[in-house]
Amino acid sequence: MSVRLSLPAPAKLNLFLHILGRRDDGYHELQTLFQFLDHGDELHFEARQDGQVRLHTEIAGVPHDSNLIVRAARGLQEASGSPQGVDIWLDKRLPMGGGIGGGSSDAATTLLALNHLWQLGWDEDRIAALGLRLGADVPVFTRGRAAFAEGVGEKLTPVDIPEPWYLVVVPQVLVSTAEIFSDPLLTRDSPAIKVRTVLEGDSRNDCQPVVERRYPEVRNALILLNKFVSARLTGTGGCVFGSFPNKAEADKVSALLPDHLQRFVAKGSNVSMLHRKLETLV
């Protein structure tokens, strides 16, 4: 009998993003604050014994072998020496290029699912180290706790912060992270701050002015949302968000936005819904 497992891949928000400088290797030193949303993709896994890794859901513009889900599965297979394979199906709800972690979250869910399915017994640090090879945002998803991040985003300090409801607007654009970080007008000299300063409200997203200038759709979404709540870009975008004390208020503002704007309302969470689900597994 085959072993099956279904797990969520939650979205995240960058509640702020400060860029401190550029390193010699081209990567940027940054500080950010990650919090999860109770909203995301869903992945379904079925173990197979012939060692093959197959993703049965096509993603437009992403070749099968380049998909982070496949790369995560094969990377874990190689690193662990497991002879097992897997069939994977993806229910895609999170946008690509949205700044809410869709690809990184899918990769993290794949690593944790296969650690369970293949009975590898890897600990959190080992999985996070493998995840970092796939992308700087993957470890925050494998660890599953809201975190203050430094370095290129891989140095994580868990935090316990308020868990409001969020209204997230999804402009219909695919923002290129590489393009934003290479923009000559990007602020790269923000001073380092303490997480307490962020909670007191002294923060911003250094990428936001560049994204607004390059992507009118994002600028327009921010203008519309700012009429009702203080709005901000998450990551390099293009999703923008505002926070609310309860679902009713978030839903009320959502109903006032133009019909053409794609959006969703979700609860913020300091423990990802993926990790809450994993805790229920035997």
UniProtKB/Swiss-Prot annotation:
Gene3D superfamilies: 3.30.230.10, GHMP kinase, C-terminal domain. The keyword Ribonucleoprotein does not apply. Its EC number is 2.7.1.148. It catalyses: 4-CDP-2-C-methyl-D-erythritol + ATP = 4-CDP-2-C-methyl-D-erythritol 2-phosphate + ADP + H(+). Pathway: Isoprenoid biosynthesis; isopentenyl diphosphate biosynthesis via DXP pathway; isopentenyl diphosphate from 1-deoxy-D-xylulose 5-phosphate: step 3/6. The active site is at K12, D137. It is an enzyme of class 2 (transferase). One of its GO terms (molecular function) is ATP binding. ATP binds at P95, M96, G97, G98, G99, I100, G101, G102, G103, S104, S105. InterPro entries: GHMP_kinase_C_dom, GHMP_kinase_C_sf, GHMP_kinase_N_dom, IspE, Ribosomal_Su5_D2-typ_SF, Ribsml_uS5_D2-typ_fold_subgr. Signal peptide: none annotated. One of its GO terms (biological process) is terpenoid biosynthetic process. Disulfide bonds: none annotated. Keywords: ATP-binding, Isoprene biosynthesis, Kinase, Nucleotide-binding, Transferase. HAMAP family: IspE. Catalyzes the phosphorylation of the position 2 hydroxy group of 4-diphosphocytidyl-2C-methyl-D-erythritol. NCBIfam families: ispE. Belongs to the GHMP kinase family. IspE subfamily. This is 4-diphosphocytidyl-2-C-methyl-D-erythritol kinase.
